[in-house]
Structures are given as C-alpha cells and as structure tokens.
C-alpha cells in the first residue's frame, strides 16, 4: 500500500488527532488495521494469501466521530475508499441497489485514483505536445488526414484540411512559443479541433439493476467507431488546458490503468459501511424485511470473500478491509444476524462527548469551527477573537441542549455556532476593518432564544 507504509500506528493516530478529539480506542484499532495491510504486503506470496484483514465495527452515538475517522483515513492513506449507507441497499431481486454495487464503486474509485496518478506522471510531456499543437493552430498549419471508412458510413464530419508547406519558418514558431510561454497570447481566440467526449444518449439496461450491467453503446463500440471530432473557438489559455488534457489522455494506457486499479482495489481497498444498525432486525416489524435481514445475508459473502463482476472484470473481495459503523440506539449489535457479527471481529465502542470534549473540539482541531468562522469573516475584513470563557460557554450550551433534547453529538456545535454568528455574518460587510471579541455575555445574548427554548438557562453559571 502506498503512503501508509510511511506511518506507524502511533503516527496514524497523531494525524487523526489533528481533526478528531478523543476516541483513542477507535483510532488505535483503525491504525493497527491499516498498518497490518502494509505488513501483509511484505509477507512471502505463499503465506500472504492466508492473512485476511480484521474488519472493524464502530459502535457509538451520532456525532462522536465515526464517519469523520473514516473520511480522514481515506485522505491519509490514499487507498481506494468508498463510503456507503447500509440503508440504501435492498435484497437481491428487489428494485434498488444491491450490495455488489459497493465493490463496483470501489473499483471505480481505484480507476480514478490510478488514472490521476498516471496523468500526473505524463504532465510535462503532455504540455510539450499540446504546445506544438497549439502553435500549429496559431500558424494555421493543418494536416490533411485520410478519411476513415467508418466516417463515410456514419457521416462524420471530414477531417480534411488544407495542408501547408512543411518549411514553415522555424523562427516564427519560436517567436510564437515565447509569446505563448510569457502569457502574451492568453486572451487571443483560437479555433482548435478536439475529440467530442459527449456520450451517446442511448443506453442499454438489464433488469438486474441499473448499475449492475449498465452497458452504454459508447463502451461497446469505443474501439470500433472513429472518435468524433469537433471544432471549438476558445481563448489560448483555455486551449492550453484542453489540449494538455487530451494529450495526457492519449499518453496513458487504460488497460494498464485498469489492471493496476483492480489489483489496488483488491489488496488496499477500504469500504466504510455507515448506518449498519439500521439494517438490524429488531423483531418489532411485521412482514418481509426487504432492506434488513435480506441485506445482511447479501453482505455475508462479500465481507467473507467472493468474486464480484464489474465492467473492469472480476474483483475478489477477500482482502478488502470493511469498517462498519452504527449508533445502535434502537437496535443492539446482537440484533444483527450472528454470521454478520462474526465477520467484524474487532468491535470498538466510541464514547459520548462531554462538555470538556466540546471545549477541545472548538479549540484543538485544524478545522475547528471557531477557526472556520474566523477565516470566513476575515474575507470581509472582520477580525474575530474569542475569550476563554466564551468558548466554554458555547461548549456548555451545546452540551446542555444535547442533554435536554436529542443528543446529536458534535453536530450540535454547528447549530449553536451558526446561531451565534447569524447577526455578525449578516452585517459583516459594514463591519469591515473592525475587531470583534466574542465574550461569554455576547454568547448568552445571541443564544438566549435557544436557551429559553430548551430551558437550559438555569444550568449556565
């Protein structure tokens, strides 16, 4: 696995600490699971096949960091990663998404990732080729291309152009090259010929689900039919970007990209299944549980290890890491079918957030809400400062409202902060150049309606 080999479990936890407060146990479990992917890659081939990832089940109330841990992990390790909602799936045979689609989504993510890497690797070469093409267009030098038989059959516009002598003054080319590189020609208009990437409107679907065998005519005949060209009149600056992208695309081997992507999805892929508690059968409902027990049974072979057909070929799920998360406030973990429970050997309980956690959430993370509002209002020329008491009061209000109503964890801070900054955000353009200090009294004044509504006024000192 790329990147993660540079991180020890302790370093992975340290990276997560920059964005997520507390939940050490969950962070440690995820860090060890990621490090084990790297350790497995170093094993001898004959033994490597015997080592499968230990899937993780994160249990905890909403808003304590389950999804955020998954999001940050995906960015950190740069592995193919997809996040899916368990509630979106239905049992095979019913209308809706089937569980195989999560594996197809993972492969798509892997293809995008590998393709971006390959495109990045050929950027410099693509720039040079694009520059030569652009100089040709600016000089009016156009090549005469033979007409493809298919172009005549399908009435494609002719690619024929007037060919100019090859002895175009090299001095003139060099002069245009220098003007191009200096940006002098950026606003000039130029007509360029590009490949038409608009997909055909007609698509073929099977009754197995729209995305299961969604075969477009473009996929079927892309190699057979000629690429349709079209003329576009754009600025030179825009033409550079368009031609660079087209040349880069021509330089990469998509077969190689797909082969690498499938391999990476199989060995490094991570699938995060959110809201898994919502497909637990509580025993209170009558009738068929289309999106509950049936979905759980469909998940079993994928998590255990099977082969899923995708448009890029068969993909084995044996070594994909599955991380599931759920609040389990209505259903219990034991309400999941026993076979599915057994597929998640590592179980982590995330703790509800305390007032002290809220204070830390407002102060410590790199993307703390307090910092976000400071930066947003700084764009209007307004400087925001917070007193220590103000931050503690905001945390206390959020915590108490959670206690008195639905506990939505750290998401409550978004509601409280938005209400707190409602007036300031509205009047910010008129306050340009001023420094505003947020005090505890200001917080109480701005949030008095919320405090009265939830009757938490009496709890705040």
From Swiss-Prot:
Keywords: ATP-binding, Chaperone, Cytoplasm, Nucleotide-binding. One of its GO terms (molecular function) is ATP hydrolysis activity. The keyword Membrane does not apply. ATPase subunit of a proteasome-like degradation complex; this subunit has chaperone activity. The binding of ATP and its subsequent hydrolysis by HslU are essential for unfolding of protein substrates subsequently hydrolyzed by HslV. HslU recognizes the N-terminal part of its protein substrates and unfolds these before they are guided to HslV for hydrolysis. Belongs to the ClpX chaperone family. HslU subfamily. CDD domains: RecA-like_HslU (cd19498). One of its GO terms (biological process) is proteolysis involved in protein catabolic process. NCBIfam families: hslU, PRK05201.1. It comes from Caldanaerobacter subterraneus subsp. tengcongensis (strain DSM 15242 / JCM 11007 / NBRC 100824 / MB4). HAMAP family: HslU (MF_00249). It comes from the Bacteria. The gene is hslU. This is ATP-dependent protease ATPase subunit HslU. Gene3D superfamilies: 1.10.8.60, DNA helicase RuvA subunit, C-terminal domain, P-loop containing nucleotide triphosphate hydrolases. SUPFAM superfamilies: P-loop containing nucleoside triphosphate hydrolases. InterPro entries: AAA+_ATPase, ATP-dep_Clp_protease_ClpX, ATPase_AAA_core, Clp_ATPase_C, HslU, P-loop_NTPase. It holds the Pfam family ClpB_D2-small. A double ring-shaped homohexamer of HslV is capped on each side by a ring-shaped HslU homohexamer. The assembly of the HslU/HslV complex is dependent on binding of ATP. It is found in: Cytoplasm.
